Amino acid sequence: MQAPRAALVFALVIALVPVGRGNYEELENSGDTTVESERPNKVTIPSTFAAVTIKETLNANINSTNFAPDENQLEFILMVLIPLILLVLLLLSVVFLATYYKRKRTKQEPSSQGSQSALQTYELGSENVKVPIFEEDTPSVMEIEMEELDKWMNSMNRNADFECLPTLKEEKESNHNPSDSES
């Protein structure tokens, strides 16, 4: 939950902090240079009126370039920040949906340890009646393990017939009559 919040805060900080390099490059490439550098050094106007007009034109050029960063910031918001916010919202919705379905699935599939109901359902006629389960009705761990052992032994006997392994009776007979195999 912290990671999406951190990503959102990071995106907002990036959007709100103006980038200084872009403004510098715009001023450098905009062609707004002082009038003095465009004129040859041979001609200098010593009058105060000329200096005032140069400063006014320079201020007007600088003020006209100040509107460009605001437009660039608006373009940045439209092109980067809005899709980024939509992507974060999409990821958050996927995370919430995944957790919702995960919780729903765990509620539907109860675990085998301790979650069994204390009531057992029996059908009596057309009605389902819930009857409490008593200790005598539930098999003990030893009974369950013995049943599993019997199943395993039966499967071993069936497999032994197919693989031509000696059965238990054949092994016992061979153990009782060792003199037959020695002579």
UniProtKB/Swiss-Prot annotation:
Residues 163-183 are annotated as: Disordered. Residues 23-75 are extracellular. Residues 97-183 are cytoplasmic. It is found in: Membrane. The keyword Membrane applies. Keywords: Membrane, Phosphoprotein, Signal, Transmembrane, Transmembrane helix. This is Transmembrane protein 154.
